[in-house]
């Protein structure tokens, strides 16, 4: 898919890259030099997991559980949208030196936002 705008798949850049996709977009439109695409913290991975709506999701009420499940460095982004099944309501980004651990933590935070019980 080609999008001439910032796209959902690049939302990880908000927390993981030196220059986010939003800033890059503005720089390109304004004919400014593009910023660095490097990760903010060398030697780490930025993992993003989307929060999709379900019939029982109430993400704003589960923020504390999500931050706890995601651990240090987990960033929760809620878009303030009305909950509908399948609708993207937000995302969680975790930056970690271990990509498998980052993915596990991001998934745990999204599960907490959905109101699901921890699986460990």
What do these predicted regions represent?
Residues 9-11, 58, 85, 101:
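Intrinsically disordered, low-complexity acidic/polar segments
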Residues 81-120:
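Generic C-terminus detector
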Residues 42, 49-83:
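Glycine-rich active-site loop/lid that clamps phosphate-bearing ligands
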Residues 47-59, 77, 103, 107-112, ...:
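C-terminal structural segment of proteins
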Residues 3-55:
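Active-site "cap" helix and flanking loop/linker of ATP-utilizing ligase/carboxylase catalytic domains
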Residues 1, 78, 96:
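Active-site proximal loops enriched in glycine and acidic residues that flank catalytic Cys/His/Asp
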Residues 27-35, 72, 111-118:
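Generic secondary-structure signature for well-ordered alpha-helical cores
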Residues 6, 27, 76, 82, ...:
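Short glycine- and Lys/Arg-enriched binding-loop motifs that mark or flank ligand-binding interfaces
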């Amino acid at each position: 898919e080609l999008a001439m705008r910032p796209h959902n798949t690049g939302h990880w850049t908000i927390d993981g890259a030196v220059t986010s996709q939003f800033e890059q977009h503005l720089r390109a439109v304004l004919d400014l030099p593009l910023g660095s695409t490097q990760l903010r913290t060398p030697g780490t991975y930025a993992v993003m997991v989307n929060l999709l709506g379900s019939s029982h999701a109430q993400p704003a009420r589960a923020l504390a559980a999500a931050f706890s499940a995601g651990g240090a460095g987990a960033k929760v982004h809620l878009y303030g949208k009305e909950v509908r099944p399948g609708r993207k309501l937000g995302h969680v980004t975790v930056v970690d030196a271990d990509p498998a651990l980052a993915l596990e933590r991001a998934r745990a935070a999204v599960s907490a936002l959905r109101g699901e019980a921890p699986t460990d």
